[in-house]
Amino acid sequence: MTELKEQLSLLGRKTEYKQDYAPEVLEAFDNKHPENDYWVRFNCPEFTSLCPITGQPDFAEIRISYLPDVKMVESKSLKLYLFSFRNHGAFHEDCVNIIMKDLIRLMDPKYIEVTGIFTPRGGISIYPYANYGRPGTKYEEMATHRLMNHE
């Protein structure tokens, strides 16, 4: 347990909210079951960012699903990371891809997918989806299959 506490600096401490995009707040911990394929899903219904052109707020539900390998993302750090987009200007599609790439850098998962379900603006809903499967593995094939059969 001491080793786990050393890996995670945010749990049980006063929360400092970053005012702009802050990938450095993401933390990972060791997966105790890396030999198993299993899903971890985060549903984040209060995501906000800013339109990079108008500065108007955008609201979304972000869904993150992944198959962990050696590392897993710590949920409080993920919450703070997603909160850091609040004053960040990025298009919906960029937000989803940035989130996915940052989590890949952090954890190197076997597979990951991120969906943004953005609240309509101007009468149009945008639901960007991005995924990744580790190259040269069955997860790469899985990513291709899921992308080609997405909705």
Swiss-Prot record:
UniProt pathway annotation: tRNA modification; tRNA-queuosine biosynthesis
Q: Which InterPro entries match?
A: GTP-CH-I_C/QueF, NADPH_dep_7-cyano-7-deazaG_red, QueF, QueF_type1
Give the Gene Ontology MF terms in alphabetical order.
preQ1 synthase activity
Q: Which reaction does it catalyse?
A: 7-aminomethyl-7-carbaguanine + 2 NADP(+) = 7-cyano-7-deazaguanine + 2 NADPH + 3 H(+)
Q: What GO cellular-component annotations does this UniProt entry give?
A: cytoplasm
- Protein residues bound to substrate: 73-75, 92-93
Q: What Enzyme Commission number(s) appear in the record? A: 1.7.1.13
What is this protein's function?
A: Catalyzes the NADPH-dependent reduction of 7-cyano-7-deazaguanine (preQ0) to 7-aminomethyl-7-deazaguanine (preQ1).
Spell out the HAMAP family in the cross-references: QueF_type1
Family statement: Belongs to the GTP cyclohydrolase I family. QueF type 1 subfamily.
According to UniProt, the name of this protein is NADPH-dependent 7-cyano-7-deazaguanine reductase
Tell me the organism: Bacteroides fragilis (strain YCH46)
